[in-house]
């Protein structure tokens, strides 16, 4: 599926401001200001300055929470977004109940205790982010994520993403589920991308971020076959 740019000149703007460059700027800025996030049972609230808030928006990390403070901005991050910034980019700090979580193991265990499928979803999220896709929540489409080639203000999302694992949820177990998902994503001009996240059996690492090394990600795009596309031209003899 070709990118569907939202306005004339959007493609040129995207080429002039690649996502990887903006993420690099964000990483540098957050590291210098020692941005601090506060972990709750469902998300992370990150306290930043106006400049960092703008960079986070350009990179599509989190959502702005409206507050009364003029100088401070509060950004609500999902667990996957927060751990990516903490573990992969190493540019923010996070605390829980007033105590700073000094290493990734503490944060990993805390997030895993709050969200049962955190490991699988984070592996899928980081897999896509590492390929410079913009990753957002897919809740409104009944999927885990939606992904964009660039900022959503420039281009429409191309894929609706479902994350599957062995022994995980029961989605896409029967043909009717697959048919419904494909029809739904097709109705909003997206392709259905299924990420199969599987791991080797290694119980010693399950509570550690090191277990991410044992996961593999297989990508599979599912599309609806249209008979009209393969019919012969009726005018031919």
From Swiss-Prot:
GO molecular function, one term: nucleic acid binding
Compartments, record wording: Nucleus
Residues of the active site: 148, 156, 190
InterPro entries xref list: tRNA_endonuc-like_dom_sf, tRNA_intron_Endo_cat-like_sf, tRNA_intron_Endonuc_cat-like, tRNA_intron_Endonuc_N, tRNA_splic
Pfam families: tRNA_int_endo, tRNA_int_endo_N
Domain of life: Eukaryota
Primary subcellular site in the record, as a coarse category: nucleus
Record family assignment: Belongs to the tRNA-intron endonuclease family.
Summary of the function given for this chain in its UniProt record: Constitutes one of the two catalytic subunit of the tRNA-splicing endonuclease complex, a complex responsible for identification and cleavage of the splice sites in pre-tRNA. It cleaves pre-tRNA at the 5'- and 3'-splice sites to release the intron. The products are an intron and two tRNA half-molecules bearing 2',3'-cyclic phosphate and 5'-OH termini. There are no conserved sequences at the splice sites, but the intron is invariably located at the same site in the gene, placing the splice sites an invariant distance from the constant structural features of the tRNA body.
PANTHER family: TRNA-SPLICING ENDONUCLEASE SUBUNIT SEN2
Name this polypeptide is given: tRNA-splicing endonuclease subunit Sen2-1
């Amino acid at each position: 599926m070709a990118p569907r740019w939202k306005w004339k000149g959007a493609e040129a703007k995207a080429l002039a401001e690649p996502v990887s460059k903006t993420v690099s700027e964000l990483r540098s800025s957050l590291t210098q200001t020692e941005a601090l996030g506060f972990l709750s049972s469902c998300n992370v609230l990150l306290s930043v300055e106006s400049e960092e808030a703008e960079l986070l928006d350009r990179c599509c990390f989190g959502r702005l929470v409206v507050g009364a403070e003029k100088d401070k901005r509060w950004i609500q991050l999902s667990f996957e977004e927060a751990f990516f910034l903490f573990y992969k980019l190493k540019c923010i700090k996070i605390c829980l109940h007033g105590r700073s979580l000094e290493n990734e193991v503490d944060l990993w265990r805390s997030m895993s205790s709050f969200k049962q499928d955190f490991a699988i979803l984070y592996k899928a999220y980081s897999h896509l982010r590492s390929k410079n896709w913009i990753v957002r929540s897919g809740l409104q489409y009944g999927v885990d994520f939606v992904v964009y080639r660039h900022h959503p203000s420039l281009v429409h999302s191309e894929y609706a993403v479902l994350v599957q694992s062995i022994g995980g949820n029961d989605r896409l177990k029967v043909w009717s589920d697959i048919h419904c998902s494909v029809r739904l994503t097709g109705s909003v001009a997206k392709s259905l991308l299924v990420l199969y996240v599987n791991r080797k059996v290694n119980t010693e690492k399950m509570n550690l971020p090191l277990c991410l090394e044992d996961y593999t990600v297989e990508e599979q795009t599912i599309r609806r076959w249209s008979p009209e596309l393969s019919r012969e031209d009726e005018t031919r003899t």
